[in-house]
Amino acid sequence: MAAAHHTRPPLTLPQAFLVALFISPLLSGCGGDSDGNGHDTSTGKVNALGISGLSYQTASQSGKTNAYGQFQYYPGETLSLRVGDLLIAEGVPAQEWVTPLEFSPDTRAQLATPSVDDEGLSTHTITEQQLITRIPVTNLVRFLIALNWTENVREGTGIEIRNRVIQQLNAALPNLTNPIDFTVSETEFNAGGNNPSPANQLLAAICFYPEGDELCEEPPTEDAINNAPERPENDEDWDPDVDYKQDLQAKRQRILEAIRSMEEVDAEDARRYLTRELNAITTIVGNRFYLDNYIARHSDADTSIKQVQIRRIGGSAELSDVEAITTRPQDVALHSYNWQTANVEYFVAGLAGGESEIVISFAPEKTYRWVRKTLRVVIID
């Protein structure tokens, strides 16, 4: 017998509409048939909260991802993504949601095969969590986080790669000792000191402060510091037009501390960020669907076949697969489930006072993700 599945009741239709309204900023522009300018392109998005400033290219569309991380495409096209002149992904199927897990053919292929959880139902989340530990994925995500304008990507915000960062990145790319390789070990990707990794060479050439800020200047050299006069002991003897040794040392320290390094963003930071983004997409996709009932009560004398329907807010529930279990088959038994009709059939098998949960896992079309909903069935006299 399957373990009991404890969960809150699925959303009723009015609740689902409220959730849809609440998450509307995340959904802005995604999945539509139009880009809002009278064209018939579709709108996709890189991650749930977006990565802005990426250059994108499809067979027919090109541009930069906007403040929401959105891009335009026609269904069936593939997508390439760059940070300035640095290619980070190509040949990616253009679709409503694109994440770093879909940047490479290998991880894309594995996402297409769901895992099975402890209840015996298909799920994509186990596969996602396995893939986000891969070094090429974590190195790339860490690099993108390091390019965010603010030093950390706060919860509830996306990654913002500003034009100022891209301009400096493009200027520095030709001077790297080697191309950036996201497949190397974390240790090699983090290398600093006298032989910094290409990623750290690039970060050292980028100032994440407004143009003209002191922190964007070259740091005073050791020779300049050594040749500078000592600051007088008495404040009244200080000359405001003189750079004293102590001042230059402090300035050098401030500038060097402002230089970012890959060591500041570790693999756990990348996994935490990517998990948050992936879970947000799953929530958005899941909240588009609901069951036509979340609790059903049937008499123990009524053993006829019952049905629960999977529905989609604002449209038909088009599925590619569906599975279901009952947590107490001695009370409520499954009869059938069908992805084409998007329903699950069951019947009462026990006595009054018994109950069971029917746990339904289904895959909407055009996504590798699986959605889970639960129907509670109570047997009455």
PLM region descriptions:
Residues 26-29:
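C-terminal motif of bacterial Sec signal peptides marking the signal peptidase cleavage site
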Residues 13-20:
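Sec-dependent signal peptide recognition
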